[in-house]
Amino acid sequence: MRLQILAVGRLKDGPERDLTDDYIRRASAMARGLGFKGPEEAEIASGGGMDAEGARLLARIPEGARIIRLDEGGENLTSEAFASRLSRWRDDGERDTCFLIGGAEGYAPDVRAAAPQTLAFGVQTWPHRLVRAMLAEQLYRAMTILAGTPYHKA
């Protein structure tokens, strides 16, 4: 199952970019042996308003992909539950799973309709550049949980 992070806006060089890249690299190295590909990250151009950003986001989603929208009102999962869900989707034959990170204005109604499944990292609102790093870390953590390596200590 291919894992994709589709994020509105460009993550500039700096500690958040370094952290995100490090976790993506680490997750990718483990993913291959667990039946996953990626995670891959794609930056969607910001600007033009929520509807324009939404159209660009939707255009990048592979047909038939499972779409998970990152949202402060989304479902909160433990790391173990997140790993289990990824494993179940893989075992159910999902080809692509896309995690969406919206722009500063949020998600257009058509994106919300296309991606009713949501995920949150707590009830707080987080800066988008930190959400990318947090998602990349959770994907890496999920790979370590599924592989049984000692990174995750519950």
Curated annotation (Swiss-Prot):
One Pfam family from the record: SPOUT_MTase
Q: Where in the cell is it found?
A: Cytoplasm
**Which enzyme type, at the first EC level?**
transferase
Ligand binding (S-adenosyl-L-methionine): L70, G102
Matching entries from CDD domains are given as:
RlmH-like
Instruction: Name the InterPro entries on file.
Output: Alpha/beta_knot_MTases, RlmH-like, tRNA_m1G_MTases_N
Q: Which reaction does it catalyse?
A: pseudouridine(1915) in 23S rRNA + S-adenosyl-L-methionine = N(3)-methylpseudouridine(1915) in 23S rRNA + S-adenosyl-L-homocysteine + H(+)
Q: What keywords are assigned to this protein?
A: Cytoplasm, Methyltransferase, rRNA processing, S-adenosyl-L-methionine, Transferase
Q: Which GO terms describe its molecular function?
A: rRNA (pseudouridine-N3-)-methyltransferase activity
Q: What is its EC number?
A: 2.1.1.177
- The answer, when asked if NAD is one of the entry's keywords, is no
Q: Note whether Methyltransferase occurs among the keywords.
A: yes
**Highest taxon of source:** Bacteria
**Disulfide bonds, paired cysteine numbers:** none
Kindly state one GO CC term assigned in the UniProt record: cytoplasm
The entry assigns this protein to a family as follows: Belongs to the RNA methyltransferase RlmH family.
Briefly, what is this protein's role? Specifically methylates the pseudouridine at position 1915 (m3Psi1915) in 23S rRNA.
Q: How does it assemble?
A: Homodimer.
> What is this protein called in UniProt?
Ribosomal RNA large subunit methyltransferase H
Per the UniProt record, the source organism is Hyphomonas neptunium (strain ATCC 15444)
Write the lineage as a comma-separated list: Bacteria, Pseudomonadati, Pseudomonadota, Alphaproteobacteria, Hyphomonadales
